[in-house]
Amino acid sequence: MRLKLILFALLSILIINNSQAQYKISIEIKDNKDTMLILGNYYLSGTFAIDTAYSKKPGKFIFQKKDKHLENGIYFFANTTGRYSEFVIDNESNFTITTNEEDWAKHIKSKGSKSNSLYFEYMNNNFVFSDKVGELNKERANMTKEAYEMAVNNLRLRSDTLKEEFLKNNPNHLLSKVLIATKEIKIPEINPIYKNDGSLDSTAMQLERYNYYVNHYFDNVDLQFDGLLRTPRAVFYDYYNKYWDEVMKFQPIDSIFKYANIVIDKSRGSKQMFKYLVHDITERYLKSHVMGHDEIYVRMIKKYYESGEANWMKPSDLDKEIERANKWEKLSRGKVVPDIQCPDTNDIVHSLYSLNSKYKILIFWAYDCGHCSTEIPKLYNFYKENKDVYNVEVMAVNSGMDLKQWREFIVKKGLNWLNVNGLVANYDWHSYFDISSTPYIVILDKDNRIIAKKISAENIPNFIKYYDQGLIKL
């Protein structure tokens, strides 16, 4: 008897799992003549086709899979000409959608899906408001400015009331998550801040507003709801990217990493959202060309991947990322580079550490590198003009194989700084500095600590100027 109960329990689990891992969505379009419809969904910045259905009877289509589960989000069915209509998957996967060929969106209804019935009702009410605004615009020429604005405001108030009622009555509906996520953050009124002379400090007040915005940016976004990943890009994707690309653009490295952790922590109730955020932020700063952003990548790998929290990566790929992070960590700003010893054009060995200057510019380059042919002369002009101004010395390390061409390039361009042959060195600097392209430029202080790297020649003058003035900190 006990064995029978166990078998029955196992069978029940299998049936439940099977019912959860399938979908059946019937589409019925009156007077429709299409032979095929496409089922698609939104994901981040794109749209994706995930299924097709062919009509066995005019206007009747069935999307069905017994081995696939549809995640929560906004989906759509479309014909081959691009006409489409949206619906939601909100913990329901077996229902029927009916509509009319005349206007798919305005006639759409649902059977067997309470979530879609609510969604369609809300959207259709909004269509009514949109139509009325359109009618007002047509009549605008025959109305006074006051009458037109009053009519539009009344419609807007009714639309806002409709939204608030929906949110109140359906707080857990997918559409509610979307509507809340698209609400702008309202910055409260900032108390006046005064300077020592009694005048209003508008800069300090603006900073207060900015700090509030940074700290409350995601207040309306439920980062524990992964359904937001499968919505039109304007709902989540664009808003999320704006945070890193614009709001946090000029923040120091420590602040960016701090807020990255805060945002990620908000997603810990959702495996999918957590995975997306950790992966995106890590990749974002791996690929960034902004100096110092590689340090964020290193910290992300250490905190989430090496610790085992990000457990979705293949072991071989994980090992490569950790190896790269360990290598890049040694190249972080403030780290001391090992001494480089190479022979010059006369085979006299020189040491990086022997350069006695306030700043040292270490350049890895090649005479046959197209980018080097433009960057090296720019850098040399800076060197000539500012060598004594900032007490700067240069070690230019050659990576080209033809030493004759290397020497000819030096003479032709008049590069009167320390030129050394990197093919003969005391260690594998190419691997140590993880050089993938040239020129690769590193700026060091007198103690051989990295203060800048992967910096272009045209940005060096301002960097050294501001660093020397104490306006740039490590």
Name each model-derived stretch.
Residues H350-L379, E393-M395:
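Short active-site neighborhood of thiol/selenol oxidoreductases, capturing the structured segment around
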Residues Q22-P171, V178-T182, K186-G227:
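A non-transmembrane, solvent-exposed segment enriched in polar/low-complexity residues
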Residues Q206, V214-R268, Q272, V278:
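Structured, charged N-terminal subsegments at the starts of enzyme catalytic cores
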